[in-house]
């Protein structure tokens, strides 16, 4: 296996109330399917998808909450070293929109301050049951300095666009050298941070 | 969230400390349906790490511990059937005692004004406002009062009260109302968004230069403002690079959730001075403190220790002696003896035998170079990350998580004597086959015959390293030998900002020893040897070489390790107890306990086997060619294995060629 099979690696993290469609968005994007039924996939930690943007291979590591949002028990460590956050609500569920400020507070507390945040209103295929108007969401996202997009994981609307636009943005941020990784990158002469300890590294 | 908890589980785990979290991951991984709850709003129990404001809220909780119980809980008594009995759990935590906080950094009023201005940029944020109150009730040492009380709004009577040191526990309730008012406009300080961080930094630097041209000044409000940068561990531990936690993290793949930094220096404290202990071959040769002869002697001795078993003649005669006696016979100069005894073997003067000492030295040397030139690793963002990472693993395999979830009692079937269910604070009965509970949750009655040890802890925020070198990003461990024989050595860990546990230009220092008195009584003398309070500086010029204390916290924590199951009264056979943090440097106790309990409960199951590689699960997406305007995308999904290995420093053996 080659060591360098991508030019960029980004960690993208999804958050938002339970049931808004986070898992479906990830699976739609990474596997191209809309999972029937409710049951969360057991044992899937994060999903990887490598995309090519303007000739550069970008590896997206997409993390889902593992259901810990259900009882408001997401671990802080989940947010660490994320390059981007996708904050999702359900356009047919007012409650999921009203919880956004609470999520933003959690982001502010635990995520890096350089993280890119995208607000996503999901389930636009259910337009007839919409409870949160596009305008309201746009105003909110503007005030919070977030990008905003509406999607349907079910109909595959805007899902590719969501992740690929995000990848583009992450690349240009990386180019400007303002990426999160720099925060923790050691100064010369110090112990590097050691990640991904794997068995094959010793003996 | 109007979501109801399921009521059938295989295993219910109460408490999210390290052993419980490892067990949760292990159980869930082996296919058990796990419910993992914690009564607190954060993960980790006494293994948690906090931001600065989080720590202050934590303190306040212990201060106010008395008035718990007003909460509406549904009575459990009616829910117990005739054939059952209940074992109630503790209502309030009693594992933390003698909390005492001190602020030495100046409390500049101007800083506050500046931040309130900044706040308007970000009106939506609103973190808890508890910190100021806590600070006010934690008393301020006299030195720093002058600047603090410059504020007219400060109630005068507080001045009298804060002479000397008053612990948080006895904060005056009457004052709190007044305090709230005073804090009214200060409350917002720490809500300043991080996004403004860079800008704020530059403004305050300008201001600093005007005020105090010579030294980079850290004020209390800066600490509060940058409070998010802190990840302050309640328990101070390191990972042995060949230790069982590292092995478990690697084996279970939980290591993918956490990053580490090397501890970069081993320090010694001898004759009032802090020195670096040369431990790797390179260190020994580069040492400026050691003479050529000492270097040769030390190298020879360390090389011998690595393979001491092959030279029994070298130590046979000293089997019955203490290690320190043995070292005296090895031609090591006093400082070399000190280094080996306290900093490398990390043993105590009196109790350690020659064999134990040689073994400890050998272990130390073998751990060197696995990841760097000391045997220790520290997790980025603090020790509190580690239990959380195991919890995530549990959740990934279907475990259900519920913080802020109080359990009122175990329901025990009278006939079988086995526990069937818990009743939570909503009065909901949740059934399971096995129950795992952290010691701190057990009631006084259950623990009546248990003798607990205590750990003395201090947390300091300082402005300089205890041993200054070219680089200001060192992570160090220092063992301060006991002043008198028989007392306990104090372990000091100094963390720099690149460990992501403290703000720039500060250090976070943890002191730990097993308690003989209150934490402050046990540790204050060591603190005074190594640091100087902030305000002493102008008076005492020679003290300038010592780092200054900006903030300090002392507390005692219960050490429930090593308690045999039979000491607890009336535990049903399917209820298992995990202990809180032990006093040791490593995490071996927690890992061993988790593994032992797991094997007891599920003898035929493997403990934390590696999960499938997420990258193997990924479907191939080549069939899709999405079109996104402006980009030329091909979507390629990949099967890859851990190319991340390149992030690792290659292991070097420093002492062996
Ligand atoms: C580099 C290094 C690596 C270590 N790795 C581990 C480890 O992986 N797991 C662990 O449990 N302890 C380890 N230790 C030992 C650990 O530091 C001490 O047990 C701990 O500091 C408690 O000290 P104490 O004063 O209570 O007991 P001590 O009097 O220091 O020793 C208590 C017991 O621990 C045993 N011990 C001492 N050193 C080691 C050692 N290196 N490895 C294993 N057992 C030892 C002794 O034989 C003794 O029975 C290590 C020590 C060093 C210096
Ligand atoms: N109609 C519609 N339903 C969706 C969409 N996305 C998710 N869902 C449904 O919403 C429910 C919750 O989705 P899930 O992805 O598990 O949400 P999560 O809890 O945020 O991960 C499931 O029943 C999905 O089928 C969508 O875009 N449209
Ligand atoms: Mg989900």
Curated annotation (Swiss-Prot), chain A:
Sequence positions that bind Mg(2+): 23, 41, 64
Protein's membrane topology: Lipid-anchor
Regulation: Regulated by guanine nucleotide exchange factors (GEFs) which promote the exchange of bound GDP for free GTP. Regulated by GTPase activating proteins (GAPs) which increase the GTP hydrolysis activity. Inhibited by GDP dissociation inhibitors (GDIs).
Cofactor(s) needed: Mg(2+)
Taxonomic superkingdom: Eukaryota
InterPro entries reported in the protein's UniProt record: P-loop_NTPase, Rab, Rab30, Small_GTP-bd, Small_GTPase
Protein's cellular compartments: Membrane; Golgi apparatus, trans-Golgi network membrane; Golgi apparatus, cis-Golgi network membrane; Golgi apparatus membrane
Lipidation (S-geranylgeranyl cysteine): 199-200
Domains as described in the record: Switch I, switch II and the interswitch regions are characteristic of Rab GTPases and mediate the interactions with Rab downstream effectors. The switch regions undergo conformational changes upon nucleotide binding which drive interaction with specific sets of effector proteins, with most effectors only binding to GTP-bound Rab.
Function: The small GTPases Rab are key regulators of intracellular membrane trafficking, from the formation of transport vesicles to their fusion with membranes. Rabs cycle between an inactive GDP-bound form and an active GTP-bound form that is able to recruit to membranes different sets of downstream effectors directly responsible for vesicle formation, movement, tethering and fusion. RAB30 is required for maintaining the structural integrity of the Golgi apparatus, possibly by mediating interactions with cytoplasmic scaffolding proteins.
Protein name: Ras-related protein Rab-30
Organism: Homo sapiens
Organism classification: Eukaryota, Metazoa, Chordata, Craniata, Vertebrata
